[in-house]
Design a protein with these regions (language model features):
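P-loop NTPase motor domains
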Residues: 30-197
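Basic- and hydrophobic-enriched, low-structure N-terminal and domain-boundary segments
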Residues: 1-22, 26-27, 31-42
Length: 197
């Protein structure tokens, strides 16, 4: 039996693609139902995080689909109504500093890719250092976008601290949009959720 919720397989996403009206949503509903039905009584029940881009799964008219997935409307997360009840940042409590260093590079690249603006190597490196410093301040607990921007600003030359650059612009957008909670309030591994987009 394949443990899709374990950490042995690092990338267990499923992609369903097709043209408009080809039945992608229905196929996805059938697949999720089959996967959940076959695994729910096993030692490795398959849970999911579904990003509902078209609003079909979160539409009250399609509540029957929720029953197929063995969830109810409380599993629908709407970031427009309230922040997603989890943090996008890892908890590195008790972990090696090098893990944070590697993560900071990955996270800096991810943040930089949000906006198409030109970002210099210096800005990217400064962001990575800011993430490391934010983790030091939080004692390796999950950081926040506010904490990262404060550390980023502190690393800027004095003359540039009051100015926005591409990195600060992206971070300010993330802060203003308030998409995520500052701590995990749900378990994304043990439960299934639909994120209304």
């Amino acid at each position: 039996l394949l443990n899709l919720n374990g950490r042995d397989i690092s990338n267990t996403q499923i992609l369903v693609a097709g043209t408009t009206g080809s039945g992608k949503s229905n196929l996805l509903a059938v697949l999720l139902n089959e996967i959940r039905t076959l695994s729910i009584e096993s030692p490795y029940p398959v849970n999911f995080l579904l990003f509902d881009y078209k609003g079909e799964f979160s539409d009250p008219a399609n509540n029957a689909w929720l029953n197929l997935f063995e969830i109810d409307r409380s599993a629908i997360l709407d970031p427009i109504v309230s922040p997603l009840p989890f943090t996008p940042f890892k908890d590195f409590t008790g972990r090696a500093q090098n893990e944070i260093n590697l993560y900071s590079t990955e996270l800096a690249l991810a943040i930089c890719s949000i906006d198409r603006a030109t970002i210099s190597a210096n800005m990217s490196n400064r962001l990575s250092e800011a993430i490391i410093n934010a983790y030091k301040k939080s004692q390796n607990h999950p950081v926040t976008f506010d904490g990262i921007i404060k550390e980023y600003t502190a690393l800027q030359p004095d003359k540039d601290r009051d100015k926005d650059d591409s990195i600060k612009s992206v971070l300010k957008q993330l802060i203003r949009n308030n998409l995520f909670a500052t701590e995990d309030r749900i378990d994304l591994i043990k439960d299934s959720y639909i994120v209304k987009m």
